[in-house]
Swiss-Prot record:
One of its GO terms (biological process) is translation. Part of the ribosomal stalk of the 50S ribosomal subunit. Interacts with L10 and the large rRNA to form the base of the stalk. L10 forms an elongated spine to which L12 dimers bind in a sequential fashion forming a multimeric L10(L12)X complex. This is Large ribosomal subunit protein uL11. It comes from the Bacteria. One or more lysine residues are methylated. InterPro entries: Ribosomal_uL11, Ribosomal_uL11_bac-typ, Ribosomal_uL11_C, Ribosomal_uL11_C_sf, Ribosomal_uL11_CS, Ribosomal_uL11_N, Ribosomal_uL11_N_sf. Keywords: Methylation, Ribonucleoprotein, Ribosomal protein, RNA-binding, rRNA-binding. NCBIfam families: L11_bact. GO terms for molecular function: large ribosomal subunit rRNA binding; structural constituent of ribosome.
């Protein structure tokens, strides 16, 4: 018989630098998960992605064991990196804070494809372009 799921927790943590401090400790501690085990495993699996924010979905079972699935970095994070900016525009309709090329959009869409509900690369690119527009990033080329 399969283990009974107690909770599912979604977190966004820096790759290779998770600590038992908030938000990890309180989120997992309230479900009785051994926090240090999670932190150690997460940091091992994400060490090669240092500097990025990696979303993780932690499934916690009744016996206090857990499994987790790593997702791709948020599109906004990847766009900020590609455009070389710190943060998006406060008023994206009037203010443009950076530029990305269609080729950069294609690369981001290919990376994000497993986590997007798009059937093909073109649809994924349109989603990423929409995110860029909402951040005040201009898509050129």
């Amino acid at each position: 018989m399969a283990k009974k799921v107690k909770a599912i927790v979604k977190l966004q943590l820096p790759a290779g630098k998770a600590t038992p401090a908030p938000p990890v400790g309180p989120a997992l501690g309230q479900h009785g998960v051994p926090i240090m085990n999670f932190v150690k495993e997460y940091n091992e699996k994400t060490a090669h992605l240092a500097g990025q924010i990696i979303p993780v979905v932690v499934t916690i079972y009744e016996d206090r064991s857990f499994t987790f699935v790593l997702k791709t970095p948020p599109a906004a994070d990847l766009l900020r990196r590609a455009a070389g900016i710190e943060k998006g525009a406060a008023d994206p309709k009037r203010q443009k804070v950076g530029r990305v090329t269609r080729e950069q959009i294609r690369e981001i869409a290919q990376l994000k494809m497993p986590d997007l509900n798009a059937r093909d690369l073109e649809a994924a690119m349109r989603m990423i372009e929409g995110t860029a527009r909402s951040m005040g990033i201009e898509v050129v080329g």
